[in-house]
Each structure stands twice: as structure tokens, then as C-alpha cells.
Amino acid sequence: AAERLTPAEREPAVQQYVLLVTGLRALVGRDREPALILDSYLLRSLAVAGWSPSFGDCAQCGAPGPHRAFSVVAGGMVCSSCRPPAAAAPSAATITLLGALLAGDWEAAEAIGQRERREASGLIAAFLQWHLERTLRSLPLVDRSETTDRILAEDQEPDAWMGR
């Protein structure tokens, strides 16, 4: 799937590379919740590839937001006139989180609750898979549970995870 986010085969994708390295460093540093890092990376990678979702103005007609509907097909938030029947209606906090993740506003992103984080992750996954034109079989396997986050936050050794 990563190859679909780069411009052409065998052509360097410096921005994608820098974004990946930055994301991996953030994961290693454990300063942020891993699920937020992943979602931010996915949104930014899509933006670098030219598929940046709109979280403010209508993605279809450009009408100023905020708007209440999110359409994967349209490219983000849509006004009531452009809203297709299958559009999602995320909470205002979820929309704020999506914008914060795209912009790298970690303070705003970390202030949003778990329910909205799960909702945002689902929208990001749908948006990513739409633009890649394929299902990412590994994406549902990413463990976003609070237990994993707690273990990482406590910086326990692998032996502690095994109960040794």
C-alpha cells in the first residue's frame, strides 16, 4: 500500500520518507499515544500524496465550514447541499481531532476523548483505503487498546508483559 502513496515507481519520495522517519521517532520516543501518532502519520502521508482531506470548508463546493457531514468520496467535510446519502456525521470533537492530527497540534489532539479518537481512526482508515483503492488487511490488526497504551506508557520490560 505504501507504494501507492509515492509519485512514481523508483522515484524518490523524500517527503514521504521524512514523514515516516519522523513518525517512527515519535513512536520510539513514547511521548505520544501510538494510535494518535499512527493516525497523524496516515493523514499527513495522504496529504503529501495529494489527497489531503478537508476538515473546514466543504470538500465539494468550498462553502465555509464548519460542516456536520464527512464524505470519504467527496474528500472530507461536506455542506448540507453537497452531502451524499452515505456521509458520516462525526461529532464536533472528532472533527477537531482530525484537523489537529493533520496539523500536528498534539495539545489539541491529546485533549480529545477515547470515543472521538476511535471515531476519527475509523474515518481515517476509510479515507485511506478509498484513496489506495484497496483494503489494508493489516490495519484492523493494529492494537489500539488502552491496555497497550498503558503498557507502553509505563515503559515496562517485555518480561513484565509476560508476567515473569
Which residues does each PLM region occupy?
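Non-catalytic alpha-helical scaffolds and adjoining flexible linkers that form interface surfaces
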Residues: 1-164
